[in-house]
A protein has these predicted regions:
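Catalytic phosphate/metal-binding cores of nucleic-acid and nucleotide-processing enzymes, i.e., regions
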Residues: 1-119
Length: 119
């Protein structure tokens, strides 16, 4: 599905805003280059030296299964491109309408959540 230039601009603005917000919190973060089928996510953020792949969505329509599939594929691409043994944690960040970055929703699956909890 092709995205309109307005949609691309909206997404790019959200990505830039998220990176700036993370940096204000002293979290190392950067936007990742778009690479089509080899896309590695929208943003990488490092927490305690660990890469976290963020798939950002600024859309009216929520399609969490599709968003999550994208995050999984892109985290795998990130790991492959860098020769990492483990795929980084991945998250879908969904912009809430008429709300700031700090009110965005963060989505992950329960399996990853329990892994992060050390279980």
């Amino acid at each position: 599905m092709r995205m309109s230039s307005y949609g691309k601009r909206k997404g790019a603005t959200f990505e830039t805003s998220v990176v700036k917000w993370l940096r204000l919190k002293d979290i190392l973060a950067e936007r990742l280059t778009k690479a089509g089928a080899k896309d590695e996510g929208d943003v990488v953020a490092f927490l305690d030296g660990t890469a976290n792949i963020l798939e950002l969505k600024a859309t009216k329509k929520l399609d969490l299964p599709q968003f999550w599939r994208e995050a999984e594929v892109e985290a795998e691409n990130y790991a492959k491109a860098r020769g990492l043994k483990e795929v980084p944690y991945k998250f879908v960040i969904v912009k809430r309408r008429q709300a700031g970055i700090d009110k965005a929703w963060v989505v992950e699956d329960f399996e990853q959540w329990t892994k992060r909890a050390g279980k």
